[in-house]
């Protein structure tokens, strides 16, 4: 199973992420976002940021997850390539770590800046054998 794919969207970028678990799908969604920014295969997981979030539904939790990661990129130039997280659907909370390093133009390719997460086309579906997350980011 592929982890994510991009789809065309006027002036923005659509991402479809997959995972056997909800946590894996959220991780792959984040990886897709950072793949827009740089080549994540060159991002070493040497630092982490702890993340604690709550939402009112899964879509809101995903929105906050991506926005929180983009906050670290905007404020600290952190790029991420590895994610360890737990989602509690009863309390609608996400707890985890995002692993990566500070962007370095000598090591990391500068691609496209992701400005923000959006609710446009945002959906989280559970199929027979995986979760599928679809969303659009503003570039």
Swiss-Prot record:
InterPro entries: Archease (IPR002804), Archease_arc (IPR022952), Archease_dom (IPR023572), Archease_dom_sf (IPR036820). Gene3D superfamilies: Archease domain. Transmembrane segments: none annotated. Ca(2+) binds at residues 12, 138-139. SUPFAM superfamilies: MTH1598-like. It comes from the Archaea. One of its GO terms (biological process) is tRNA splicing, via endonucleolytic cleavage and ligation. It holds the Pfam family Archease. One of its GO terms (molecular function) is calcium ion binding. Keywords: Calcium, Metal-binding, tRNA processing. Activates the tRNA-splicing ligase complex by facilitating the enzymatic turnover of catalytic subunit RtcB. Acts by promoting the guanylylation of RtcB, a key intermediate step in tRNA ligation. Can also alter the NTP specificity of RtcB such that ATP, dGTP or ITP is used efficiently. HAMAP family: Archease_arch (MF_01222). Belongs to the archease family. This is Protein archease. It comes from Saccharolobus islandicus (strain Y.N.15.51 / Yellowstone #2).
């Amino acid at each position: 199973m592929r982890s994510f794919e991009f789809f065309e969207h006027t002036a923005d970028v659509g991402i479809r992420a997959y995972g056997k678990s909800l946590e894996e799908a959220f991780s792959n969604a984040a990886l897709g976002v950072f793949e827009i920014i740089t080549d994540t295969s060159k991002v070493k997981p040497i630092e982490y940021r702890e993340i604690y979030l709550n939402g009112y539904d899964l879509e809101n939790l995903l929105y906050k997850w991506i926005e929180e990661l983009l906050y670290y990129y905007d404020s600290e130039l952190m790029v991420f390539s590895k994610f360890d997280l737990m989602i509690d659907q009863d309390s609608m909370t996400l707890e985890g770590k995002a692993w990566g390093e500070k962007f370095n133009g000598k090591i990391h390719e500068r691609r496209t800046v992701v400005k923000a997460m959006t609710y446009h086309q945002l959906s989280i579906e559970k199929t027979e054998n995986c979760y599928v997350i679809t969303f659009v980011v503003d570039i």
